[in-house]
UniProtKB/Swiss-Prot annotation:
InterPro entries from the UniProt entry: Flavodoxin_fold, Flavoprotein-like_sf, FMN-dep_NADH:Q_OxRdtase_AzoR1, NADH:quinone_OxRdtase_FMN_depd
Similarity section: Belongs to the azoreductase type 1 family.
Annotated cofactor note: Binds 1 FMN per subunit.
This protein's name: FMN-dependent NADH:quinone oxidoreductase 1
Species, as recorded: Bacillus subtilis (strain 168)
Highest taxon of source: Bacteria
PANTHER family, sorted: FMN-DEPENDENT NADH-AZOREDUCTASE 1, FMN-DEPENDENT NADH:QUINONE OXIDOREDUCTASE
EC number assigned by the record: 1.6.5.-, 1.7.1.17
Length: 208
């Protein structure tokens, strides 16, 4: 039995947002094909996540060094540790996220800030940083209304590229992606584009 963490980063409904459609399609198909796995859902918009700042940075550093912390530092470090430990414990992780203003939603970036911890998800060596999450399987479900996979907009795509870069830095190699794009740019083809992507998500979930 595997523990699978589903991370949802849009608070839009399935009727409003395609990344939520992707999330729900993948989740349902995964549960159907893996009834014995432990599925943990994390809706980032319901978590009230504080931004990474001084107290969290200092607190997590001091905790790692065994140094005395202020009460605010303890509180902030405990918040980051909660999500980091949950992520590390999971055998598989599924991220569903839209492209908003060329990048990921702020809640997802904040969550990733919590996870990027030297000594846990990566380590420093004399040869440079080395990722420590090589045994984790990850799926990225991304939706963007325009076309960013090619052409002049490709250089502006900083959602999927951001997640791939971070996960690669952490050593994740077993990485799978499903992208739905262009449905807003071509409204006459939107239904076909979305349905094709949802089927890809279901197919991936069946073997993930």
């Amino acid at each position: 039995m595997s523990t699978v963490l589903f991370v949802k980063s849009s608070d839009r409904t399935a009727e409003e947002g395609v990344s939520t459609k992707l999330y729900e399609a993948f989740l349902a198909a995964y549960k159907e094909n893996n009834p014995n796995d432990e599925v943990v859902e994390l809706d980032l918009h319901k978590e009230n996540l504080p931004y990474l700042g001084r107290d969290m940075i200092n607190g997590t550093f001091k905790a790692g060094q065994g140094m005395e912390m202020t009460e605010d530092e303890k509180k902030q470090a405990a918040i980051a540790d909660k999500y980091l430990n949950q992520f590390v414990k999971a055998d598989k992780v599924v991220f569903a996220f839209p492209l908003w203003n060329f990048t990921v939603p702020a809640v997802l970036h904040t969550y990733v800030d919590y996870l990027s911890r030297a000594g846990v998800t990566f380590k420093y060596t004399q040869e440079g940083p080395v990722g420590l999450m090589g045994g984790k399987k990850v799926a990225l479900l991304n939706a963007r209304g325009g076309v960013y996979s090619e052409g002049p907009m490709a250089a502006l795509e900083m959602s999927l590229n951001f997640m791939k870069t971070v996960l690669g830095f952490w050593g994740v190699q077993d990485l799978h992606t499903v992208v739905i794009e262009g449905h807003n740019a071509a409204p006459d083809q939107a239904q076909e584009i979305v349905e094709k992507g949802l089927q890809e998500a279901k197919d991936l979930a069946a073997k993930f």
